[in-house]
């Protein structure tokens, strides 16, 4: 997946735009053609890529594009995932674009900038030839490509068909327009992406490194956590602490709050002062009664659908499919009450996570969705609380099983203003014969690519067995630097808390959460328990009144006796 994303990036990089810095004033318009008119996972991947170059990305389906969509847009990308006859209106609008256009997949031959383009065949290839490097590049998993012919300009990449003939699949016209012969943007080939970028003259910048200490909950071993954080500190490495404020017992539903674990809080505060940056990794990292660290929290994994109820006692409502409704409007009307429940649930979780951590002296600077799963509406809600998010992104509105990330820091339209720090090298997987094997492969790929983000995570419960080697592997990436989140500009806020960093390494905090509010928030009761507490309060009140009345009678009696004695004396 990373490879195709970088391949696309390389093509887009033919424009005079820095690969490492966004032009905030420039905009990118993505026009897509899909079978059902919806933003597919591939379209969202393209959005993630484009968001690296600008935070002003507009994504429109072909039939909805208007002339106003082109205003303020320096670049236009057309993506044809399916074959379709494009409207004359759309073709006229694209033909009027003065700067180079990128076209991907089908239908590009209808666009004037690619007049004469012919797509002869679709093949799965395992070796391609880079014209710029004059070298063959092997593809481990293969790549589905469209054979290109009929264009004037330069073939950037070619492949050999089974019969031995050579065909091109990526082309640059004489006027600088770029065609990429791919339809599936989720394929995986990093080597091709690196070669393609070089073919377009992209100069690599500094590779950004980051390492998250993952799944830190109130039940984590604080000694192992301190050991890992101290090691990174001694190596002068800033690190990320992905914290879950509440542990949920899957058998009883009981909660263990971080604030009730003083040893863990002390360790986290110490690590925060030693270069660690806290991020919210969910509130419980669980949905219903799944175990903390295993549950999804912001996606119903069992039903594979968005959250429909925040109450663990309620049976899940299985959402109907859009095809079961007469039109799109009827479907959206049906979804509205469920979206309201999802909004309430998500806001409560994020608010409590931020406020619980802040009240313990731990100041979260970003967000990481548990298991990287969340609906796009969930991302929109999260953007009201955070300016940055870590990890990968769920690319489907119907299943959690499709996720991905670009090789760069990005601010796509689907994240509604949040900046994504992508996870690209994975984690230490002890279920494998070589737990570090896949990470080492991904690190090698990032070395070849140059100038991206090499981000991964490590579970502190593994102890120190793999951490030194992992850090050594990451630091072998040349021209790289570690991300210090405190030295970036971040904002995290709720109605009662505001956390800001201005980029100088300091954190400014405004905390309006009272200890009393926090106590009652942590001791929410069932209706029966509330009734018992009310009854207890009433009984206590009567006891207090009885005791007070008893003291009153005794005091009155003493006064009477005193007066009687004085009168007799």
Swiss-Prot record:
Subcellular location: Cell membrane
Statement: the UniProt record of this protein carries the keyword Hydrolase: no
Range of residues in the leader sequence: 1-21
Sections of the chain in a coiled coil: none
GO cellular component terms, A-Z: plasma membrane
Transmembrane segments: 531-551
Protein's name according to its UniProt entry: Uncharacterized protein YdaL
Disulfide-linked positions: none
Keywords, ordered alphabetically: Cell membrane, Membrane, Signal, Transmembrane, Transmembrane helix
Positions on the Extracellular side per record topology: 22-530
Pfam family, one: DUF2334
Tree of life domain: Bacteria
Membrane topology label: Single-pass type I membrane protein
Topology feature Cytoplasmic, residues: 552-569
């Amino acid at each position: 997946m990373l490879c195709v994303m970088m391949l696309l990036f390389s093509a887009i990089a033919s424009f005079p735009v820095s690969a490492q810095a966004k032009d905030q004033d420039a905009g990118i318009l993505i026009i897509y053609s899909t079978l059902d008119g919806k933003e597919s996972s591939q379209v969202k991947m393209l959005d993630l890529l484009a968001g690296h170059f600008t935070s002003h990305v507009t994504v429109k389906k072909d039939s909805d594009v208007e002339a106003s969509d082109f205003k303020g847009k320096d670049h236009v990308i057309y993506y044809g995932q399916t074959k379709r006859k494009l409207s004359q209106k759309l073709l006229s609008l694209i033909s009027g674009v003065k700067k180079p256009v990128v076209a991907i997949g089908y239908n590009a031959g209808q666009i004037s900038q690619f007049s004469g383009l012919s797509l002869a065949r679709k093949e799965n290839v395992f070796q391609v030839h880079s014209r710029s490097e004059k070298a063959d590049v092997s593809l481990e998993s293969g790549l589905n490509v469209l054979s290109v012919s009929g264009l004037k300009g330069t073939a950037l990449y070619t492949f050999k068909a089974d019969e031995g003939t050579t065909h091109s699949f990526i082309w640059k016209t004489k006027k600088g327009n770029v065609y990429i012969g791919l339809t599936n943007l989720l394929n995986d080939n990093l080597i091709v992406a690196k070669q393609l970028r070089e073919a377009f003259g992209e100069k690599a910048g500094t590779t950004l490194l980051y390492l998250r200490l993952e799944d830190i909950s109130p039940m984590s071993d604080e000694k192992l956590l301190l050991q890992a954080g101290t090691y990174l500190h001694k190596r002068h490495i800033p690190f990320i602490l992905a914290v879950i404020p509440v542990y949920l017992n899957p058998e009883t539903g009981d909660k263990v709050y971080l604030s009730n674990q003083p040893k863990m809080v002390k360790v986290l505060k110490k690590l925060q002062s030693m270069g660690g940056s806290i991020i919210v990794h969910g509130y419980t990292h669980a949905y219903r009664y799944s175990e903390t660290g295993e549950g999804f929290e912001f996606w119903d994994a069992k039903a594979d659908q968005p959250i429909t109820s925040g109450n663990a006692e309620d049976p899940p409502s299985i959402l109907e499919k859009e095809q079961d409704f007469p039109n799109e409007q009827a479907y959206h009307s049906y979804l509205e009450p469920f979206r309201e429940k999802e909004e309430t649930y998500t806001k409560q979780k994020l608010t409590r996570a931020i406020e619980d951590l802040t009240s313990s002296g731990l100041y979260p600077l970003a967000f990481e969705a548990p298991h990287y799963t969340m609906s796009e509406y969930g991302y929109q809600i999260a953007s009201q609380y955070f300016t940055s998010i870590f990890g990968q992104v769920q690319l489907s509105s119907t299943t959690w099983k499709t996720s991905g990330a670009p090789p760069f820091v990005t601010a796509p339209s689907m994240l509604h203003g949040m900046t994504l720090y992508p996870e690209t090298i994975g984690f230490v997987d002890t279920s494998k014969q070589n737990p570090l094997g896949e990470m080492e492969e991904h690190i090698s790929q990032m070395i070849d690519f140059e100038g991206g983000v090499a981000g991964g995570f490590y579970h502190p419960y593994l102890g120190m067995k793999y951490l030194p080697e992992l850090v050594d592997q990451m630091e072998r990436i040349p021209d790289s630097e570690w991300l210090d989140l405190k030295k970036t500009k971040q904002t995290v806020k709720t109605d009662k808390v505001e956390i800001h960093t201005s980029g100088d390494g300091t954190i400014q905090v405004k905390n309006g959460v009272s200890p009393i509010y926090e106590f009652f928030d942590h001791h929410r009761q069932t209706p029966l328990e509330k009734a018992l507490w009310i009854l207890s309060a009433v009984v206590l009140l009567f006891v207090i009144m009885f005791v007070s009345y008893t003291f009153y009678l005794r005091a009155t009696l003493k006064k009477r006796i005193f007066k009687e004695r004085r009168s007799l004396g």
